Amino acid sequence: QDAVAKGGLKNVVGTLAMARTNDPQSATAQFFINVKDNTFLDPTPIPPGDPVPVFEYQNKTYKNVPRNQLVSSPQLFGYTVFGKVVEGMDVILKMKSTPTGSGGPFPSDVPKTPIVINSAIVIK
C-alpha cells in the first residue's frame, strides 16, 4: 500500500510488469512486456493528508476523500514494473506482431503459435 501512495516505476516501452487479476495481491508468476507507453497501468500516487484534500483520478477531481478509502482501492495499485528489456527489443516487436486469437479462458490476445522465451538474464 505504501507503493500506491508514492507511485513507482512507469509502464513505458520495454519495461516488464507483473500481470494480475483485479486483486492487487494476485500477481504471482505471470508478467508482460510493455510494447508501448501504458501510463494508465501505473500506480496512482496518493497525496498526503487524511482526509486527502484534493485527489485526481481519470480526469476527475475528488475532495476530502478518506485516506483509507484510497489506499484500499484496487484501481489505484497499477501494475508493478520490475525490469526492463536492455537488449533484444527487436525480438519483442516480432513477438508483438504474432497473430493472436482466443485461447483457454481468454477471449483474445493469445498467440496462435506459442511463444517461448528460451533465455533471459538479470543485470544488476
Q: Where do the protein language model's features map onto the residues?
A:
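Cross-family detector of peptidyl-prolyl cis-trans isomerase
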Residues: Q1-K124
